[in-house]
């Protein structure tokens, strides 16, 4: 009989077991108890992925034990973020109590409704279209176990915010759910997408619950002053950050054409490359040209709108989107290329009317073919930006690039796609939350003892650099780990 080895975390510690190939994790736990005489405690009920009771951590990700097939060397642990009662059983009572405080039922301002008023409450399918998208939750709590904002701040978690959204979107409910959402720290969510990634019912909590609820919350006047400052920036200069020096778009030419062209792209710069990280933008041009890619740079492009979509300010984001669509839809290029994870995710997922293809710069480089790079004898680790890894499903390309540089040693950190804490308006709106989440990321980076931290997102660059600096001082460490954009790295070896 062919077997796999799995490790189960019991109350007294980890223990390894041999189990037959082909079982689910739930089957394997039952097999272990029966075959080895163990008494591992775990929850289960329907065994069909409908009750949500069997969720556990499998290789550091929350999944349903009844729907996950055993693989060799899997590690099974109780859900993170909850007190453990015994073995794989966690205490769910705090969650249920919190749900109770959120008035988890439709409420009317006036319980006594006249027949005339009742007649006016007729609903049609379109009235509940937003509710339908988020009501399939089975309370497995997988999203809560993975949520960085819930772990490191006073944020109730994705599914509780989903519940508030469910009632806020229901015309029958008349309570001020937006005020409840604001009081429950809806702006603590980094929109990292971990909850979406692990949801067994594939509920898009980020886009269909949190961001839509933030839009309603903002319209009711429940907002953060710092988010309004970002709003002022874009209204005055079409960028989300203040201008500090000559912009990238002012410094460069309209186009950089190469002979024997493999591909022609339009460069969407984003706010940080244009106003803060001009040298990375110039590196991008050189790197693309070196790979046989011609670069067109539209000078009248504006902010992609991501900071405003994420924080509920959709009146601003729609205006910005319209301007960019008018510019980029007219271009005769193979693709629009982005150097920012947030910009790329926004263009790919939120620009529904686009007539152009969008690619991250690492996707472009791998597609046209990597070239022979000069050797570079350094050790690096890599951070997956949330809006690249989960927002665009791009994670192999950066690794292919790093592994193609001679003498460069690439090592993975513990959880490379763990959120750094900067996204979703959290760095500007809730800096203390961003700092708390960033501290864990810094710990993972320092544990690798790498010479450099490499990433692809300018926003992540800024925040991780700040997190590492604070971590260095807090722990009295002498070794600094600089943060470098993968394009800056390539500019050194082309």
UniProtKB/Swiss-Prot annotation:
Q: Where does [4Fe-4S] cluster 1 bind?
A: 137, 140, 143, 199
Q: Which UniProt keywords apply?
A: 2Fe-2S, 4Fe-4S, Iron, Iron-sulfur, Metal-binding, Repeat
**Pfam families found in the cross-reference section:** CCG, Fer2_3, Fer4_8
Q: Where does [2Fe-2S] cluster bind?
A: 46, 51, 54, 66
Asked whether the UniProt record includes Amino-acid biosynthesis among its keywords, one would answer no
Please give the Gene Ontology molecular function terms for this protein: 2 iron, 2 sulfur cluster binding; 4 iron, 4 sulfur cluster binding; electron transfer activity; metal ion binding; oxidoreductase activity
Reading the lineage from the top rank, the first entry is Archaea
Domain spans labelled 2Fe-2S ferredoxin-type:
4-82
Residues annotated as domain 4Fe-4S ferredoxin-type = 127-157, 178-208
Binding residues for [4Fe-4S] cluster 2, per the UniProt record? 147, 189, 192, 195
Which Gene3D superfamilies does the protein's record reference?
A: 3.10.20.30, Alpha-helical ferredoxin
In its keyword annotation, does this UniProt entry include Metal-binding?
yes
An annotated GO BP: tricarboxylic acid cycle
Family, per the entry? Belongs to the succinate dehydrogenase/fumarate reductase iron-sulfur protein family.
According to UniProt, the name of this protein is Uncharacterized iron-sulfur protein MMP1067
Which species is this UniProt entry from? Methanococcus maripaludis (strain DSM 14266 / JCM 13030 / NBRC 101832 / S2 / LL)
């Amino acid at each position: 009989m062919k077997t796999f080895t799995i490790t189960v975390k019991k109350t007294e510690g980890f223990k390894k077991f041999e189990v037959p190939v082909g079982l689910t994790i739930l089957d394997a736990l039952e097999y272990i108890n029966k075959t080895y005489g163990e008494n591992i405690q775990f929850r289960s009920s329907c065994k069909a992925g409908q009750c949500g009771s069997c969720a556990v951590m499998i290789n550091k990700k929350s999944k349903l034990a009844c729907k996950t097939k055993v693989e060799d060397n899997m590690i099974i642990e109780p859900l993170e973020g909850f007190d453990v009662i015994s073995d794989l059983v966690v205490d769910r009572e705090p969650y249920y109590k919190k749900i109770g405080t959120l008035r988890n039922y439709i409420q009317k301002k006036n319980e006594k409704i006249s027949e005339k008023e009742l007649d006016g409450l007729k609903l049609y399918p379109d009235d509940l279209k937003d509710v339908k998208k988020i009501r399939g939750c089975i309370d497995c709590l997988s999203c809560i176990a993975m949520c960085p904002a819930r772990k490191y701040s006073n944020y109730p978690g994705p599914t509780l915010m989903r519940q508030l959204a469910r009632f806020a979107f229901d015309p029958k409910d008349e309570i001020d759910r937006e005020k409840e959402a604001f009081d429950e720290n809806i702006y603590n969510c980094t929109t990292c997408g971990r909850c979406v990634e692990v949801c067994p019912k594939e509920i898009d909590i980020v886009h269909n619950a949190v961001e839509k609820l933030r839009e309603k919350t903002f319209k009711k006047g429940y907002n953060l002053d710092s988010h309004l400052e970002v709003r002022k920036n874009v209204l005055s200069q079409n960028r989300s950050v203040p201008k500090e020096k000559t912009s990238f778009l002012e410094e460069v030419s309209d186009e950089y054409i190469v002979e024997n062209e493999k591909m022609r792209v339009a460069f969407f710069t984003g706010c940080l490359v244009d106003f803060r990280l001009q040298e990375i933008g110039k590196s991008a041009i050189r790197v693309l040209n070196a790979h046989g890619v011609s670069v067109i740079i539209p000078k009248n492009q504006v902010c992609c709108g991501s900071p405003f979509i994420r924080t509920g300010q959709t009146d601003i984001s729609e205006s910005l989107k319209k301007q960019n669509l008018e510019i980029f839809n007219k271009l005769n290029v193979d693709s629009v290329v982005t150097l920012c994870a947030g910009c790329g995710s926004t263009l790919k997922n939120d620009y529904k009317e686009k007539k152009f293809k969008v690619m991250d710069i690492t996707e472009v480089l791998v597609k046209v073919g990597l070239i022979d790079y000069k050797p570079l004898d350094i050790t690096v680790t890599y951070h997956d930006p949330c809006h690249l890894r989960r927002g665009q499903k791009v994670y192999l390309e950066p690794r292919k690039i790093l592994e193609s540089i001679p003498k460069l040693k690439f090592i993975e950190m513990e959880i490379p796609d763990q959120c750094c804490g900067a996204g979703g308006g959290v760095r500007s709106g809730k800096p203390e939350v961003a700092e708390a989440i960033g501290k864990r990321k810094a710990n993972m980076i320092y544990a690798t003892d790498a010479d450099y931290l490499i990433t692809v997102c300018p926003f992540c660059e800024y925040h991780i650099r700040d997190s590492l600096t604070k971590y260095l001082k807090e722990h009295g460490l002498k070794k600094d780990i600089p943060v470098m954009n993968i394009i800056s790295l390539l500019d050194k070896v082309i």
